[in-house]
């Protein structure tokens, strides 16, 4: 079966391989292998399992190896007990017999805290983790008498559960040393004597040892996780590994002169702090790093028992326990007075307040629900007051999705560790997001606040052929007509009904088969647990998340909205499976058409395996999606630095690597390279959409003679439009539309040189979408939100990075900051709706704000010419809200040289958008 791609080349339909992937589904369905995540299922049925890929594992193991010194212990085995003997203990035993070697039961010895592992369960107690004989006791000295400079530590990931796939003959021949570790040891000569050294004579292909470049043939295995091993006890030591875990091997080798074993380890990259935090590690360290920052989350009860007066009896939950939070907790009486007594007296609704604490301004947000009050305080330097309520609403909705209600979530004592983990992630994202997001540049505060606060998910447009294949694969999975998921298989009801699913790639939503409200519930959970940036930055070998959820669309259902129909009384579960950069979220329903769920159901391996098979089926589309991410931006974007005169830009700007520009310059033979820039773009130094810089001649107003003296961007005019015919400000749209059009060369206008291009090249050039009208492209940035579908489109991170310069990053920052204020004005202009009650009549006489804009002036900060003033570039940031026929919000940033109609831009962006 063949079809045609968007560029005209033949494309073999992916449907031809469906039978092959059906066989994969069958293999996974009827496989007897035990899932690796089975041991991490908690008592309440929830599961949070994260396993890194091979590359991330090597970085993690290298870090673990670097953080531990070479220290080994001796172990003496008996039938039911094991004795750990250190050199210090042996010396004491030889000197006197006053102290005997202390014997511990195997279960107590095995109780240890696992090192950073690829398998972690959310909120699981360390005492419930698999035990291990490989214990590193604090205060023990090295116990292997060898030269320190000849020792090296390497870490490998061992999984005893995979032994079932190893043939019995190989396991019997080499034992666990070959079957589990992959090391071939052939006793002979002096090494074959009882208790001799374990010399590595070979490595089994595809084994854990062969994947580690530090393990070489000829090395001697001295210790396994600080336990001295010989040919006599190696099988006993390896048999004590209870489950999948990292094991540190101490090897004796001959190092070349001048090369230390730690040289390669120190150069290994560090594991993302986000991964360690998701595993439940480093929470104390991260919390201590912001202990001096005033912040707190408290759940207070307004129902106080006057008979039994107790200290802090109104505090149901508090996080964190620090000195700064203690000062906020001490003034909780003010919070109770504002939100309870004052509200009862005035009848108003208190949503936020501000106070000074330790020379810092702190914003406090409130959410009152029945007789309970949720209080969240954050520093004003991290969260603006106009965005605080959006943050509170996001937290409340996420907690309701997870626990059904705030009272149910905070009142249950068992949820306290999970809530601590939740708020640890929450405050880390607000106060120090750079610790979680591994990036070369500091995350933009206002950019993340604005985009994360939108009631929508970031959408990535795909070519039609790839989009069709993705939707087809998801529809095949959601049909549930295979194996145990079919009613005809056993003649009984299936366990769950798949209500829908959504698919992410590197944090971008590429397919959605969920209703809007369910999509927002799922994405809020993924956003608060940082699952979207996790899949974007790292290749995940396996991610499995399972928990019961309470979709808000069903919790707040209204029977009058759909007469004659009511939602079934069912329970809902969220299944998230990640594989490499793909992540699929599935919403399941138990009850109604499916069997009723009893107790606390655990994840069913059949459903997990089928989602994995779906992601494996989509893996072949990886190259096409990456090509879309690396393609030039559509619509075309301009860099703000291109609109500065030549003196305001770096003199090192040269002709870039634009495909059309390269073909154009190859077709035309100019007299000199400098002539190319002057003939095409009027000035030397021009670059294409991803690197080409234009130098249009600006008018006197852009030359900087009448600009501001400071080097920071300044807002010089504000543009408002009330209703359909509201009047503008002093420099509003009236003066804006009458502004004379500035004539200067367009870096995207080829003119008569178009004739030198071939017919196909001309067609490709015409396919480039330009949103702005006229011959020039003056669009710098945009965000379009489709409220009905719950998505928004914006330039990708790659597209933003390509448009770098001295002014453009500051322009993007101003755009995000300004959009926060514009959207707040939009929300305040809408008819006021009490979030906890019925709709109330609006008091605004002129109707809702439909358009709002701010005019900025920007100057380069690296201006060194003292004789001439710095050039000034002016641009607009305009927001447009459309209520009819389809609710939309459109934010755009463009140069002031052209009078654009934002609604026309929004129409061009959304026209033909298939979701």
Curated annotation (Swiss-Prot):
One of its GO terms (biological process) is nervous system development. It comes from Danio rerio (Zebrafish). Pfam families: Intu_longin_1, Intu_longin_2, Intu_longin_3. Plays a key role in ciliogenesis and embryonic development. Regulator of cilia formation by controlling the organization of the apical actin cytoskeleton and the positioning of the basal bodies at the apical cell surface, which in turn is essential for the normal orientation of elongating ciliary microtubules. Plays a key role in definition of cell polarity via its role in ciliogenesis but not via conversion extension. Has an indirect effect on hedgehog signaling. Gene3D superfamilies: 2.30.42.10. Residues 165-253 form the PDZ domain. Residues 88-144, 688-738 are annotated as: Disordered. Transmembrane segments: none annotated. Residues 128-139 have a biased composition (Polar residues). It comes from the Eukaryota. It is found in: Cytoplasm; Cell surface; Cytoplasm, Cytoskeleton, Cilium basal body. This is Protein inturned. PROSITE patterns: PDZ. InterPro entries: CCZ1/INTU/HSP4_longin_1 (IPR043987), CCZ1/INTU/HSP4_longin_3 (IPR043989), CCZ1/INTU_longin_2 (IPR043988), INTU (IPR039151), PDZ (IPR001478), PDZ_sf (IPR036034). Keywords: Cell projection, Cilium biogenesis/degradation, Cytoplasm, Cytoskeleton, Developmental protein. Residues 104-118 have a biased composition (Basic residues). Belongs to the inturned family. GO terms for cellular component: cell surface; cilium; cytoplasm; cytoskeleton.
């Amino acid at each position: 079966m063949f079809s045609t791609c968007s560029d005209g080349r033949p494309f073999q339909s992916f449907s031809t391989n469906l039978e092959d992937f059906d066989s994969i589904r069958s293999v996974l369905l009827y496989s007897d292998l035990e899932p690796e995540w089975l041991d991490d299922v908690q008592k309440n049925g929830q599961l949070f399992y994260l396993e890194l890929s091979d590359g991330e594992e090597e970085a993690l193991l290298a870090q673990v190896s670097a953080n531990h010194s070479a220290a080994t212990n001796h172990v003496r085995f008996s039938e039911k007990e094991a004795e750990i003997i250190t050199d210090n203990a042996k010396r004491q035993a030889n000197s006197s017999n006053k102290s005997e070697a202390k014997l511990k039961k195997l279960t107590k010895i095995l109780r240890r805290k696992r090192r950073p592992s690829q398998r972690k369960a959310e909120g699981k107690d360390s005492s419930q983790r698999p035990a291990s004989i490989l214990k590193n006791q604090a205060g023990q000295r090295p116990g292997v008498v060898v030269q320190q400079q000849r020792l090296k530590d390497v870490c490998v990931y061992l999984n005893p559960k995979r032994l079932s796939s190893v043939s019995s003959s190989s396991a019997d021949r080499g034992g666990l040393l070959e079957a589990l570790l992959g090391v071939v040891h052939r006793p002979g000569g002096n090494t074959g004597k009882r208790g001799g050294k374990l010399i590595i004579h070979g490595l089994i292909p595809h084994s854990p040892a062969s994947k580690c470049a530090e393990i070489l043939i000829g090395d001697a295995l001295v210790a396994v996780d600080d336990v001295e091993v010989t040919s006599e006890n190696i099988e006993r030591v390896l048999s004590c590994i209870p489950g999948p875990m990292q094991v540190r091997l101490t090897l004796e080798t001959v190092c070349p002169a001048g090369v230390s074993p730690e040289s390669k380890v120190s150069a290994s990259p560090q594991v993302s702090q986000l991964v360690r935090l998701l595993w439940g590690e480093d929470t104390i360290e991260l919390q201590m790093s912001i202990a001096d920052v005033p912040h707190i989350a408290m759940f207070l009860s307004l129902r106080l028992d006057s008979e039994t007066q107790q200290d802090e009896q109104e505090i149901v939950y508090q996080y964190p326990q620090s000195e700064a939070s203690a000062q906020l907790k001490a003034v909780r009486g003010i919070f109770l007075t504002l939100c309870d007594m004052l509200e009862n007296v005035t009848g108003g609704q208190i949503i936020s307040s501000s106070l000074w604490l330790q020379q810092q301004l702190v914003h406090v947000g409130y959410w009152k629900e029945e007789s309970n009050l949720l209080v969240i305080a954050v520093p004003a330097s991290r969260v603006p007051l106009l965005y605080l309520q959006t943050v509170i609403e996001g937290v409340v909705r996420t907690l309701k999705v997870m626990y059904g209600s705030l009272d149910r979530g905070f009142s249950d004592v068992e949820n306290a560790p999970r809530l601590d983990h939740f708020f640890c992630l929450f405050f880390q994202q607000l106060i120090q997001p750079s610790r979680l997001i591994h990036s070369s540049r500091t995350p933009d505060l206002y950019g993340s606040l604005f985009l994360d606060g939108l009631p929508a998910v970031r959408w990535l447009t795909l070519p039609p052929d790839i989009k069709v294949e993705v939707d087809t694969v998801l529809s095949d999975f959601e049909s549930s007509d295979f194996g145990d998921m079919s009613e005809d298989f056993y003649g009984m009801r299936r366990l769950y009904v798949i209500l829908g699913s959504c698919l992410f790639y590197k944090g971008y939503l590429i397919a959605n088969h969920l209703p809007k409200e369910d999509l927002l519930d799922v994405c809020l959970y993924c956003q608060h647990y940082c699952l979207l940036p996790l899949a974007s930055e790292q290749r995940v070998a396996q991610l499995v998340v399972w928990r019961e959820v309470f979709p808000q669309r069903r919790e707040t259902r209204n029977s009058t909205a759909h007469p004659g129909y009511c939602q079934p009384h069912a329970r809902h579960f969220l299944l998230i499976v990640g594989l490499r950069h793909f992540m699929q979220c599935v919403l399941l329903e138990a009850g109604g058409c499916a069997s009723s769920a009893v107790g606390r159901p655990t994840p069913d391996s059949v459903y997990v395996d089928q989602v994995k098979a779906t992601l494996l089926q989509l893996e072949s589309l990886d190259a096409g999606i990456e090509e879309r991410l690396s393609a030039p931006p559509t619509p075309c974007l301009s860099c703000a630095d291109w609109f500065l005169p030549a003196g305001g830009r770096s003199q090192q700007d040269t002709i870039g690597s634009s495909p059309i520009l390269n073909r154009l310059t190859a077709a035309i033979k100019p007299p000199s390279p400098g002539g190319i820039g002057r003939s095409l773009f009027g000035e030397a130094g021009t670059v294409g959409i991803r690197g080409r810089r234009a130098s249009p001649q600006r008018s006197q107003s852009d030359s900087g003679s009448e600009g501001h003296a400071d080097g920071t961007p300044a807002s010089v005019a504000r543009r408002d439009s009330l209703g359909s015919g509201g009047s503008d400000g002093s420099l509003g749209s009236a003066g804006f539309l009458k502004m004379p059009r500035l004539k200067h060369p367009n870096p995207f206008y080829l003119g008569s040189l178009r004739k030198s291009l071939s017919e196909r090249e001309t067609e490709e050039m015409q396919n480039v979408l330009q949103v702005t009208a006229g011959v020039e492209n003056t669009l710098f940035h945009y965000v379009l939100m489709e409220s009905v579908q719950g998505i928004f489109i914006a330039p990708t991170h790659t597209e933003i990075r390509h448009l770098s310069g001295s002014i453009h990053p500051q322009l993007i920052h101003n755009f995000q900051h300004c959009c926060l204020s514009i959207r707040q004005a939009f929300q305040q202009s809408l008819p006021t709706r009490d979030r906890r009650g019925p709709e109330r009549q609006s008091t605004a006489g002129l109707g809702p704000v439909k358009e709002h804009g701010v005019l900025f002036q920007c100057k380069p900060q690296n201006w060194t010419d003292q004789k001439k003033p710095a050039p000034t570039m002016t641009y607009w940031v305009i927001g447009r809200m459309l209520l009819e026929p389809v609710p939309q919000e459109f934010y755009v940033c463009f140069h002031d040289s052209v009078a654009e109609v934002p609604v026309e831009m929004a129409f061009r962006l959304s026209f033909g958008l298939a979701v």
